[in-house]
Regions:
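A glycine-centered beta-loop-beta connector
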Residues: 27-30, 35-51, 91, 99-114
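The conserved cystathionine-beta-synthase
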Residues: 13-31, 78-95, 102
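Short hydrophobic/aromatic-rich motifs at helix boundaries and adjacent loops
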Residues: 6, 22-26, 38-40, 58-61
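Tandem CBS (Bateman) regulatory domains
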Residues: 1-10, 48-77, 81-92, 112-141
Length: 141
C-alpha cells in the first residue's frame, strides 16, 4: 500500500513568524500534536506540543515568542513514492510518531502512527514502530 493512501493531505501549517500562542491554539483547535513550519510551501521544520512545553516553558518563553526559537529543523521526511511499510520502518528507526511527506521540498502530507495503525496492510509495522518508539530512555546520571 502506498503512503499517499493513508496520509493526511492539505496539512495546516504555520510559518517562522508565528507565535507560540498561535501554534498552541491551532494545535488545540485541530486536535493535533504537531504543526509543520513552512515558508512558501517548503517544509523548514516542525513544532510539537512537547517542544512548546519542554523548550518553551523551560526557557521562560511566553505566548508571544516566535516559534523560530524552538522548532525542530532536522526533520526526517518521507516521499509519496514510499510504501506504508517503508514509512513505518523509517518511523521506527528514528523513533518518531509523525512523518511529513514531501515532494521537491514541498510539504504534501503528513502520516502518523495512527494512520498506519488503521491501514490493514501495516498493523504489524505500526505496532513495531510504536514498540520501538516507546522504549524508555536511559536515565542520565
Amino acid at each position: 500500500m502506498n503512503i499517499t493512501e493513508v496520509m493526511t493531505s492539505n496539512v495546516e501549517t504555520c510559518n517562522l513568524k508565528s507565535s507560540c500562542g498561535e501554534v498552541a491554539n491551532k494545535m488545540k483547535s485541530l486536535d493535533v500534536g504537531v504543526i509543520p513550519i513552512c515558508e512558501d510551501g517548503k517544509l523548514i521544520g516542525l513544532i510539537t506540543d512537547r517542544d512548546l512545553v519542554v523548550n518553551g516553558l523551560a526557557n521562560n518563553f511566553n505566548a508571544n515568542t516566535q516559534i523560530s526559537e524552538m522548532i525542530t529543523t532536522d526533520v526526517i521526511t518521507g516521499t509519496k513514492h514510499m510504501s506504508v511499510e517503508q514509512a513505518a520502518d523509517i518511523m521506527s528507526q528514528h523513533q518518531i510518531r509523525r512523518l511529513p511527506i514531501v515532494e521537491d521540498g514541498q510539504l504534501i502530507g503528513m502520516v502518523s502512527l495512527g494512520d498506519l495503525a488503521v491501514s490493514n496492510a501495516s498493523n504489524k509495522e505500526a505496532g513495531k514502530a510504536l514498540e520501538d518508539i516507546s522504549v524508555p530512555a536511559e536515565p542520565t546520571k
